[in-house]
Amino acid sequence: MSVLITKIKLYNFRRFREYVIEPNEKCNILIGDNESGKSTILEAIDLVSSGNMRRLEAIGLDNLMNIEAVTEFVNGSRCYNDLPKLRIELYLSETSDPTVNGENNSDKKECDGIKLVCEPNEDYRTEITEALLTQVDYFPYEYYSMRFSTFADQAYTGYKNKLRCAMVNSDKMDSEYATNDFIKRTYYQYTEGDPKERAIFKSKYRQMKNNFRANSLVPLNGRVPQDKHYTFGLKSSVATDFENNLMIYEDEISIDNKGTGKQIFIKTDFALEHSGSNVDVILLEEPETHLSHVNLRKLVRKIAETQNGQLFIATHNSLISTRLELNNVIILHCDSDNKPVVLKDLSADTAKYFRKVPPASITEFALSRKSILVEGPAEYILFEKFYETVSNHRPEDDGIQILDVRGLSFKRYLDIARLTKGKVAVVTDNDGDVLENCIEKYADYSDNANIKICYDTDESKHTFEIVLYWDNKELCDELFSNSAQQYMLNNKTEAAYTLLCQDKGINVPAYIKEAIEWIRR
């Protein structure tokens, strides 16, 4: 039975001063702004599960410790007892392993888990105190201890994994180290049930090298002058041992000779194939990178069909977010509190709806603090011009997202907005009945201060083109002849584009102006 992560707690790790995530049991889709910490979450899981001290030292504590915590200390008391600590805790489902169960966690509760703690080494208290007294802007990274341990306070290493983790990072596909690390981890996972088998492989590989040297190199060494005492042989080092010379092949071609997109697909496929049996947790870093749309759809389908193990996927892609169910989305913001926004409470019906329809920038909407939803392409074409006319700003300057959403989808988006607490203005047609189409239809959202429905109150002006025509009659008649209104109704996007490209000013309909002014407050 696979082990699951039930909670992640970060203290002074990279950008996070204090952060808590309670992940879903199966799939977790991390979306967020740039620098919001998506990759940091994956790194935290991968680092703690690895128990690899050498890797930790290679990264360096100065690159892992939260810079705000360091600055605050340096500019503050500079007292030994106030030195910040770095801590990553992974709370686990019941593992039936007594060595991981205990109360050595920040919750002070008996449960299963593993952690990384970096803190001042008490053995160097005197040296640290003296350095802090004599050196300005000094922080004693080199006097910190770093320890991987379980909640039972037992140390562990990569050879005694408590959580089996597979990481596929699209940003490092061209890295020889990343490929070797992936292959080695995969090999360990495939052979974890029989450590004796690993010893046999190593022994046979060493014998093969010895036989090659003893037999095949004899003619070559025979040409070396005997008085030189030199011979040709094979390298004998960690870099040339059996595990470091393994390679994964597809159709007789090694994966390091495959394209980057193909490497992503193969590595993810390998990890998914044994999720739940040899792998507990799979971490995917922006799998959409380097993949064509068709191959991305194949990869998403393969991920969706995976029944075992726990997935963490960092992405910017709406296809991934919607096809793998919006309920699984976890939203990180750069300026958020100590918890992310989760969509696990989104109705199953709405999640299913977005899984079936085109992705339609749903990730951008979920991340946006302020959004304006418009009903069709004609409104969308002209909306930036309207916005600049009303505010003398561009929407992006004010951090506002404009999205073209079919009218039937408005309520689906508003369901998401209620969870993200984003500010949303809906610009919609009254379709000839204000009460039914604009008031009663959105009654469930009327008490939400972050949602506003904007529409023209004149029921004779039932659609955007008619409102636009009567607010700009002279200009429209000039551009589209005497039957301008009918032309605009029959050629909505073409008419909107023509209005956008002409040089004269356009009067902004009152309900659109209302939406723009409200969203900017």
Predicted regions and their residues:
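Electropositive, glycine-dotted interaction segments
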Residues: R87, E94-N210
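Surface-exposed acidic, glycine/proline-enriched linker/cap segments
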Residues: D62-C79, S347-L367
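Extended helical coiled-coil dimerization/tether regions that scaffold
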Residues: T186-I266, F270-V281
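Acidic, Mg2+-coordinating catalytic modules of nucleic-acid enzymes
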Residues: S361-I372, Y380-R521
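Conserved nucleotide-binding/hydrolysis micro-motifs of P-loop NTPases
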Residues: E94-D97, E119-Y124, A152-D153, E288, ...
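Conserved P-loop NTP-binding catalytic core
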Residues: E43-K108
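Conserved catalytic network of the ASCE P-loop NTPase/AAA+ motor domain
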Residues: C79-L83, S106-K109, F139, L272-S277, ...
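Switch/communication elements of ASCE P-loop NTPase nucleotide-binding domains
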Residues: M1-S49, F242-E364, Y380-I381, E388-V390, ...
